[in-house]
């Protein structure tokens, strides 16, 4: 070309035109016309020396196009059928493996009978996986001769990928999924079965077989199921509104969650019939079908994943400016040939090299650099090998080499900054038709969460050409070998760690222990690599460390954050996670901990209360002792997951601890389960069992335990055991629609307890009143001997006129008793000069009354005196008035 240009300056215009056309024809003759699309893409980048290699490559192993790329979602089944008839002919051997490797990824399984590739990816399998399908034929000497090959990709999306997209990807009928999909802001009702299994220990075939067995048991299609491992020991969902037990007595493995969708925004009344899950899970039929113990099940409403807000982290980045100095010329490097060693096929991972930024306070005139192009040719092997880069010593900065995603095998150069010691300006490097713009080496001022970098698609046995920009100074050239690993190279400054994935938000509940393991991909450092190699520190605002008494604690050795909030911590709390590398530089991630109130509230079916020896202040003021108490209580119940215990209260009176068990369903009353848990920890009289005491000692010594019902079981007492009450037999109950179970239990209490007690009390009261009246009445008609004697002594008998016998009149007590032989007395002597008393008229009247009687009735009976009294007469002064006078006795008649 230089000769042509030189001659064109000397020849006339017609000669110049002829030479120009001749040059164009010669240049076109160097490029063959290939129908392949890959050759058409590379015809502006490959030199003539590469055409023979490329032609041999296409003739040796033709690439078959026809296997489309696939996508998979974490926790959902993946299945693709490989069209082997397009790849292999009769007698060929099909080999499926990861591109450049001998085996498939750990989550994929190849079924040679059905020619299907299936598997179930986990969270650690996110990213792009390239699968190579090759056909080989057995040669005469026993070696395998490659025939055809094809490479396709499978991209694994995270679990919180769009539900509609993930289900549509796995479902054979997209129309069915669209019809049953929920609205964008509508929660999805999910039924989850908790299995005592470890997915990381299963082979891909065992995971798929587990889904097939659940499909035959529950009649739910595979594309609707999701199988993920338990994270942070959270076996149970605190937001579940229905739950039930399984047949597993205790959890041994890490645990697996197998779930499927029931509907949209369902509640307890609108949930479809789940008897096919509830009874088999409890009785063991589901465990026998699946081959793994069933811990329990629950139903909860899952809100659709909302886009996370983007946090920005500001770094102290310099501003690139031009440097002052004379123009320099980049020296052209002669082409060098790098021959890789004949090793096993391997795919080079994408690498990224960050060059140091350029800062100069004085702007100047930009220098002129000449862009050169060095040809690095790679010998074709079974798998593309990343070539090592050769650069000049001194202050030469190697160019950044990164494969693009669309042009196979082409390594895209990026702009490289010059260190401050040189006098050149950062060159502007251009690439021919790049599919993706190159990344500048300077650090940007904002950072966004990035996904796993998508690796380029490998193409079997294709050579690559690398375009490298060289910047040199006057130092003598010396060959050095550079790598792109994470180990710091000599002379490069330490770079601060970068925040890759935000922690963003942590949810916790009052009284429930939580723990969060910081993922290893949260931060990344170019020298120290992943997060587990960095030193993490949890701080509050203004660089204040979290105290020992804080309800949130962080273990920097295991990089585990844990805590136990109480009711005073309800709300949103902001914390900062600092990651520091060995050089002392750090990065910060701000995240929030949202503390929610107890989802069950006061509706827990049972409350467990235990009394321990000790001072309650020692437990209340020490978060570590509270956490240890919760862990020991969970261990006493046989649960490895501490989130099954919700601490309600710690009060005085030694140490009185009240808690609830989150594994118990709210409705209906789980009487048998509560009784089983009660018998596990306490005797019938409330004394703790030895197993419970051994689980909590020596830190906590229990003295008594009480288990009382609450919520749907509030009318029951479990510990201490109450003697059973005799309940009369009843007829089979009639189903009454829309009857409240709580109201029914209240009616039973009134019917069997309150009403009989009131009736018995009323009967006893009436009987007492009747007995008292009868006693008073009987006592009123009887007198004692003393009362009778007093009556006789003090009283004078009164004889009424009607009571006298006229035939035989009683003798008069006023007349003297005269016998029959008795003679009349002598008349009284008369004395002379006797004065007549004033009462003479009375005596005279009296004598006059008696005298005629004696004269007229001489036959009158003699006088009979009354019988003598047994007691002396007392109190004769009280004689009643208006007494009927006695009739006078008959007159006395002398014989």
From Swiss-Prot:
UniProt key word Phosphoprotein = yes
Please provide an example of a Pfam family that matches this protein in its UniProt record: DAG1
Note the superkingdom of the native organism: Eukaryota
PANTHER family according to UniProt: DYSTROGLYCAN 1 (PTHR21559:SF22), DYSTROGLYCAN-RELATED (PTHR21559)
Residues annotated as region Disordered? 381-460, 478-498, 724-746, 823-895
What is the protein's species of origin?
Answer: Homo sapiens (Human)
Protein name as annotated:
Dystroglycan 1
**Any idea which residues bear Phosphothreonine here?**
790
The residue ranges flagged as biased composition, category Pro residues, are 724-735, 859-870
- Segments forming domain Peptidase S72: 603-712
Swiss-Prot/TrEMBL keywords: Autocatalytic cleavage, Cell membrane, Congenital muscular dystrophy, Cytoplasm, Cytoskeleton, Disease variant, Disulfide bond, Dystroglycanopathy, Glycoprotein, Host cell receptor for virus entry, Host-virus interaction, Limb-girdle muscular dystrophy, Lissencephaly, Membrane, Nucleus, Phosphoprotein, Postsynaptic cell membrane, Receptor, Secreted, Signal, Synapse, Transmembrane, Transmembrane helix
Q: Which PROSITE patterns match?
A: SEA_DG
Q: From the UniProt annotation, give the residues forming the signal peptide.
A: 1-29
Record's SMART domains? CADG
Lineage of source species: Eukaryota, Metazoa, Chordata, Craniata, Vertebrata
What happens upon changing residue 892 to E?
Redistributes to a vesicular internal membrane compartment
Listed Basic and acidic residues bias regions: 736-746
- Subunit description: Monomer. Heterodimer of alpha- and beta-dystroglycan subunits which are the central components of the dystrophin-glycoprotein complex. This complex then can form a dystrophin-associated glycoprotein complex (DGC) which is composed of three subcomplexes: a cytoplasmic complex comprised of DMD (or UTRN), DTNA and a number of syntrophins, such as SNTB1, SNTB2, SNTG1 and SNTG2, the transmembrane dystroglycan complex, and the sarcoglycan-sarcospan complex. Interacts (via the N-terminal of alphaDAG1) with LARGE1; the interaction enhances laminin binding. Interacts with SGCD.
* Residues covered by region (Mucin-like domain): 316-485
